[in-house]
Amino acid sequence: WKLEEIYNLKDLFEKWTICFVPILNPDGYEIYENDFFAIRNPIYRQMLRMQEVSCKEFTGNARGIELRKNFPTGYYRRKQIHQQPASENETKALVRLFQDDPGRGLLSFGYAGKRIVYFRQSQAFTANQKSYRMARHLQKCSASDMDKKNFHLEDVEPAGRQGYGSPEQFYTEICHQPAFRIEVPCENEVHAASIEKQIEYREIHTLPLEYIFSL
């Protein structure tokens, strides 16, 4: 019941429930692994091939929708006239989860740079200061050397471009709780099995626990 000789998981699970959503974009995962042949609908498959985007660089679902920009945030912007927020089943499922059980915070993990992003709320100075302090704490906890910050810290304003249609911004708007995105570099398969990847995992695997114990 002890993790890293620090975290008493027995006490934690008697008081808290951690909800894991493993893959927000299962279509994207299948496309990455199996090329566009993973798309069963021949019309969508041909449509995405015509975009001339490599399956390894493609970030949408089987319908070509970027799910990270599909949430109905206050500053949602369409890229195309026919696009609508929360149009995808994957988005609707997560929206329903947030509405049914708002929880006390959201930590999302993804590939990009090496940074911890915290999302601000509109007209909520105290809440935003709390999110900033928590982000700093997570930044320190992710460092293997406490004197060296491995993750860059960044914030997103409610009207900021990064927040348009994102699940984190949507969560802060409807649940009024802190939301963070922890990003790690996307490397090749050789790197995935390397010692560096194991170190990277150790840097972030306790962040959800640190968040809970800091509430």
Question: Which ranges hold each PLM region?
Answer:
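C-terminal accessory segments enriched in acidic
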Residues: 71-215
